[in-house]
Amino acid sequence: MSMWPRSRVRIPEQTVLVARAAFPNGSVAMSARDHLGEVFTDEQFAAAFGVRGAPAESPGALALVTALQFTENLTDRQAAQMVARAIDWKYALGLELTDPGFDASVLSKFRTRLVEHSLEEQVFTRMLTVLAGEGLIGAGGRQRTDSTHVISAVRDLNRLELAGESVRACLEALSVAAPDWLTEVIDVAEWAHRYGPRIDSWRLPTSQAKKDRLAQIYGTDAVALLRAAFAAEAPTWLAEISAVQTLRVMLVQNYLITTDSRGREVIRRRETDTDGLPPAKFRITSPYDTDTRWAAKGDDLFWNGYKVHLTETCDHDDEPDTTTSDDDASRPAPNLIVNVATTAATVPDVKATTSIHQQLHERGLLRRAARA
């Protein structure tokens, strides 16, 4: 997909007239355009696009839509609808009133493209630069940092589901990477019956004895598959496939290989009370996202995912708002988010403070900070 940078976009006259009539006191979107101008330009995102292919939607406009979307807590579909029907958004984007907007899928593709080209902080950093130029943020004053949970985009799995789904994910990867080799080392019909559908607790046995037996089967299959992949006669690159590595980690964390009194090999699942499990910060919870972790905050918040630490200015929180004038210059500066840091869900808030302060220092925004 190609990108042809737009020159500075002037707001169409008809859009200005209708927007001013509809919003005589303005709106967040209109204020952003009036006070901050065109915050984002297409040139800032040129590295994420090629010079050939179908023309892309303006990345500068998509960046502004993303910022407005976050401000109003909208889904992609809702944000795309706002571009098509909201007059104040058309004003902010410099669009004609008749502009139909774009499909909602464009926003997720835009975010993906930013991540793939390591431009994920470009939007936030650019916004901070503009706000600093307006004198709304800077060094000095007070800040506060607090964290909240981020739920991962994977299905929550119990230990039995995790074992079976890890084998299934590995089989899926190997069936694509080395289909001929895979048919030589497993009974395709039997394994397809066992691992064809996704492993779901709704389909699993209800009795504990049958669950224990199934856990042993999953462990035995995992060992057999890994031994085949790491065998001397197997292609060496098979062991480097991420799904194979994930299956190996799952096996080590959840199973034990021992021998019975007759010297026979026994593969059994680890028992929490007697065998122990790895600490939560090391224990994988899904074969499809090996960074997500189970965590708790307080007595009643449990989640599988990550933690995001938000730092905002709070210079005027202790001051009552006695402003009666409509003059923006007489109003105190708003509280603004100046740093976003994502960590593993198991990282305590206090452990993230040092790295957060370093990020603020690099941006020239380090203040007298305190945890909320």
Question: Which functions belong to the PLM regions below?
Answer:
Residues 84, 102-369:
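Polybasic low-complexity intrinsically disordered regions
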Residues 22-67, 71:
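Basic, short loop/linker segments at the boundary and entry of helix-turn-helix/winged-helix-like folds
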Residues 52-56, 97-101, 344-348:
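Alpha-helix capping and helix-loop boundary segments enriched in small/acidic/polar residues
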Residues 79-91:
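DNA-recognition alpha helix
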Residues 1-37:
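Charged, often Cys/His-bearing segments associated with DNA-binding zinc-finger transcription factors
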Residues 88-106:
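Short, positively charged loop/turn segments that connect secondary-structure elements
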Residues 53-57, 87, 370-372:
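Acidic, metal-coordinating catalytic cores used for nucleic-acid/nucleotide bond scission
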